[in-house]
């Protein structure tokens, strides 16, 4: 189930099409705390989607608008700038050491497939916050390579080609 909670921290998307998905983690284990932060105008931060550890999804910004998730200096590829204006941002509730739950990843894969299908995003353009701000960010990998990038790219490829892919979310332990 997905609920929509409008964030004031957004702008109208310019005529640039969506070509990236940027995946983050929240650096917190609190879904409700992240919701409060994203709807606080003083925070000046948001994402299009938040995926909780139980698989719950909240949407804060319509995909037609710009969420403020990647930072103004973010570039992908290097030299192109403007990541927020051409991307969809997804935050996963988690920290550098918490890893991700099976329920959370299952919801992420379904969400990611829909976004890729709607916007025709190439699998190599499903990236992490660490990719667009490498000198400042480590998410969603955290302290080690815990994010399953091969699965994310397989889900994106399957969504583009309308083929099935068998994915396993992981453990909810």
Please give the residue ranges for each predicted region:
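Active-site-adjacent loop/helix surface patches within enzyme catalytic domains
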Residues: 1-121
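Basic/polar, cationic surfaces and motifs that engage anionic cell-wall
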Residues: 85, 95-173
């Amino acid at each position: 189930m997905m609920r929509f909670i409008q964030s004031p921290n957004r702008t109208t998307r310019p005529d640039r099409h969506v070509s990236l998905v940027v995946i983050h983690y929240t650096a917190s284990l609190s879904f409700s705390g992240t919701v409060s932060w994203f709807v606080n105008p003083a925070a000046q931060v948001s994402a299009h989607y938040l995926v909780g550890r139980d698989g719950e999804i909240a949407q804060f910004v319509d995909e037609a608008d710009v969420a403020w998730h990647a930072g103004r200096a973010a570039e992908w590829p290097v030299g192109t700038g403007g990541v927020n204006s051409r991307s969809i941002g997804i935050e996963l509730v988690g920290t550098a050491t918490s890893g991700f739950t099976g329920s959370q990843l299952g919801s992420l894969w379904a969400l990611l497939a829909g976004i890729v299908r709607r916007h025709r995003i190439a699998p190599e353009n499903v990236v992490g916050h660490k990719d667009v701000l490498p000198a400042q960010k480590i998410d969603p990998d955290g302290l080690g390579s815990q994010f399953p990038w091969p699965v994310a790219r397989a889900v994106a490829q399957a969504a583009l080609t309308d083929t099935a892919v068998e994915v396993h979310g992981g453990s909810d332990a």
